[in-house]
Amino acid sequence: LRMCDGLPTMQEVGAVAALAQCLVHSLDTQLDRGYTLPRPTPWLLRENKWRAARHGLDAELIIDDAGAVRPVREAIAELVEDLAPVARRLGCTTELDDVRTLAAGPGPAGRQRAAVAAAGGDIGAAVDLLVAEFAAGHPLPPGSGVADAVHAGAAAG
């Protein structure tokens, strides 16, 4: 599984872990029932990997060989809905539901980029934000008191 990285809060870690757990369980069940997984062409995989790396949650992924695209956020919402019964069986409904929250916002990478931009390009602001969010236990978007202090401290430092 290729998953996102830089998850600073346990809520976000739990959400991504639940998504991975539910996906693996669902696909394993389907394979046990004789379902074969589609094999996307190599060019499609390379292009979607690039799009995801470049645009993150704002990416539009190619969904077929004809080049039709779908926004990542829309695909995630549908995937979470499809995996809801699996999450109920596995006891991770709350964590899987948190994927919706994570996908609706800028995500950790977006928050880190915003912190760096607010600090005039100082990459240390991203580290400071990660530390502050880990300590707080939840995301701290720009505009919140602690995040503003982190951004201001990075700009002053």
Provide a role label for each language-model segment.
Residues 2-157:
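C-terminal accessory/tail domains of diverse enzymes
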